[in-house]
Regions:
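Surface-exposed, low-hydrophobicity interaction/linker segments
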Residues: 12-80
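Ordered hydrophobic segments in well-structured contexts
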Residues: 50, 88-92, 124-126, 138
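Mid-length scaffold segments of soluble, non-membrane domains
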Residues: 73-120
């Protein structure tokens, strides 16, 4: 990531922060941080869960994972954490205006990624809105987060390149649930 900033350590966590210039000239603050490993125990689907970071990057989660795709409505984190366990990256946003241009840039990044080398299929990426997010854009990988004030394609591409691979060596190339049409947790 270009800009100012650097690596640091905060309570045993590694962090990297930078200010980058987006293609349209806006300044974007980007923070990448390692997070404590919250484990990978399973609870029942739709049980209430709490996490150590926002966005979450590990912890107790549901036995089912969300299908790797783009969603127009929020996906419960219990499903998304299971995606991370299988090596996926979750990209989430909280934009009161819907940020259609930024979502389009995110989709363009995802569409342009090389296939997953272990699956021969598209990379395991979930893109979804998240109204609980306390920043405009974020990404999670297993025990890593990226938090940013705007969508910066290079920052997200670098994060994906660095952290795409979770602790579970099972390929989990496909499958997953998509309950968005009927409601994730009735």
């Amino acid at each position: 990531m270009a800009g100012c900033g650097g690596l640091g350590s905060n309570n045993g966590r590694t962090t990297s922060d930078a200010q980058v210039q987006t293609a349209d000239g806006h300044a974007c603050n980007v923070v990448v941080a390692s997070q404590p490993n919250g484990g990978h125990l399973h609870s029942s689907d739709c049980d209430p869960l709490t996490f150590a970071s926002n966005p979450p990057s590990s912890g107790t989660h549901y036995p089912d994972w969300a299908k790797y795709k783009t969603y127009s409505a929020p996906v419960p984190w219990g499903f998304l954490i299971h995606c991370l366990e299988h090596g996926a990256i979750d990209i989430v946003y909280n934009c009161p205006d819907g940020c259609p241009d930024e979502v389009s840039q995110a989709q363009s990044l995802i569409d342009g990624l090389a296939p997953d080398p272990g699956c021969g299929a598209p990379m395991k990426i979930v893109l979804a809105p998240d109204p609980s997010l306390d920043i405009r854009w974020a990404a999670s990988a297993w025990t890593w987060t990226l938090r940013t004030t705007c969508f910066d394609k290079q920052a997200f591409a670098s994060f994906i390149a660095a952290y795409y691979q979770g602790p579970d060596t099972e390929a989990a190339c496909g499958g997953g649930l998509d309950l968005s049409a009927i409601g994730w947790c009735p």
